[in-house]
Amino acid sequence: MNFGLSLIFLVLILKGVQCEVKWVESGGGSVKPGGSLKLSCEASGFTFSNYGMSWVRQTPEKRLEWVASISGGVSYTYYPDSVKGRFTISRDNAKNNLYLQMNSLTSEDTALYYCAR
């Protein structure tokens, strides 16, 4: 029996920010438990490096969960216990890119993933 995870990646702009955001799906839409995926979000229309950025997700039950945050500038990172040690948020200010590396994926990680400012 295949216990693959169905992961869908979306990008959400919060606070009425006027910018274009591209989303990139990486690694396909289905991953086996224990697998890895990297999400990427490219932003424009604001000074990316000045803002903290986050990843959030919406579960199949429609719950919103915070996944990770990274500060602007020095880039401090923050995670809930549910993903700490498995997920890594990072940013490339020169390219206006936000990333989420997800390792050791489980069925609990099945969700819609959103990039947010």
Swiss-Prot record:
Residues 55-68 are annotated as: Framework-2. GO terms for biological process: immunoglobulin mediated immune response. Pfam families: V-set. This sequence belongs to the VH7183 subfamily. Residues 1-19 form the signal peptide. PROSITE patterns: IG_LIKE. GO terms for molecular function: antigen binding. This is Ig heavy chain V region 7-39. Residues 20-49 are annotated as: Framework-1. Residues 86-117 are annotated as: Framework-3. InterPro entries: Ig-like_dom, Ig-like_dom_sf, Ig-like_fold, Ig_V-set, IgHV. The keyword tRNA processing does not apply. Residues 69-85 are annotated as: Complementarity-determining-2. Disulfide bonds join C41-C115. Keywords: Adaptive immunity, Disulfide bond, Immunity, Immunoglobulin, Signal. It comes from the Eukaryota. Residues 50-54 are annotated as: Complementarity-determining-1.
